[in-house]
């Protein structure tokens, strides 16, 4: 008897820089290494190449749309993909894709899990409704105890469905001995680093709560010469870039 090869579909807004994107790629590799079929559905991005290296199949679809008037059309296209791929499990990794994809789990009788990567804030009624879709999964993955606490504070009735799965880190990616000197020199020249000055680096996507402004404020109190590199701060958010420039 031939053992069935299960197909897992991960759906996220895009494949650009971020923890969600990195997690999807790493989960995809783990799935394929364990004889699962991995498909990923997103609107694309510069991490597509990394995803394909895992052996996953990528479908490009506008699942990042926050326009409810477009969801039905996108949902119809997504339904075709899920049926053609005989998907056994859907993993919804963000709110907009969840609003599009969750109803299909019910229609096609496919189990759905959701994952929560950000804090839920009690802002207003409509925001709570928008956030609530991530609590509809058969299982809710929280990436930390802090996130679990945040979910329970906003949606106390879903506590039994939450599973905390902490983010892993591939230490080989951050091992300096694995980086060739020529690459280090090339990147230093590209950034414009000066020799013999200490380098302070912050690597993060552009977001107010990531701590950029705290770092800039702290560095303003340092009297010694240094170089500060903000990796990722210019990733498309021009309004945020302008705020940083004004602060500096």
Please provide the spans of the model-predicted regions.
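N-terminal strand-loop element at the rim of the active site
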Residues: 5-6, 10-18, 22-70, 152, ...
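A conserved mid-protein helix/loop that constitutes part of the nucleotide-sugar donor-binding site
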Residues: 18-29, 198, 202, 207-221
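Short His-centered aromatic/hydrophobic patch
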Residues: 92-98, 116
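Carbohydrate-associated surface elements
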Residues: 146, 168
């Amino acid at each position: 008897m031939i053992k069935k090869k299960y197909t897992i579909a991960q759906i996220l807004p895009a494949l650009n820089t971020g923890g969600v994107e990195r997690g999807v790629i790493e989960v995809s590799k783990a799935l394929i290494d364990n004889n699962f079929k991995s498909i990923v559905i997103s609107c694309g991005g510069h991490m597509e190449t990394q995803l394909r290296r895992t052996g996953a199949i990528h479908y490009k679809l506008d699942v990042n749309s926050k326009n409810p008037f477009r969801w039905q059309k996108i949902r119809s296209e997504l339904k075709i993909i899920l049926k053609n791929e005989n998907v056994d499990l859907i993993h919804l990794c963000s709110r907009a894709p969840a609003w599009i994809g969750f109803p299909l789990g019910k229609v096609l009788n496919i189990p759905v899990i959701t994952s929560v990567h950000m804090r839920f804030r009690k802002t207003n009624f409509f925001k709570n409704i928008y956030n609530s879709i991530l609590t509809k999964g058969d299982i809710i993955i929280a990436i930390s105890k802090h996130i679990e606490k945040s979910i329970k504070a906003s949606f106390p009735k879903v506590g039994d469905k939450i599973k905390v799965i902490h983010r892993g880190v591939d230490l080989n990616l951050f091992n300096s001995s694995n980086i060739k000197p020529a690459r280090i020199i090339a990147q230093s020249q590209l950034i414009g680093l000066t020799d013999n000055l200490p380098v302070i680096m912050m690597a993060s996507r552009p977001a107010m709560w990531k701590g950029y402004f705290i770092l800039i404020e702290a560095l303003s109190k340092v009297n010694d010469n240094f170089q500060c590199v903000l990796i990722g701060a210019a990733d498309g958010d021009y309004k945020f870039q302008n705020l940083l420039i004004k602060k500096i």
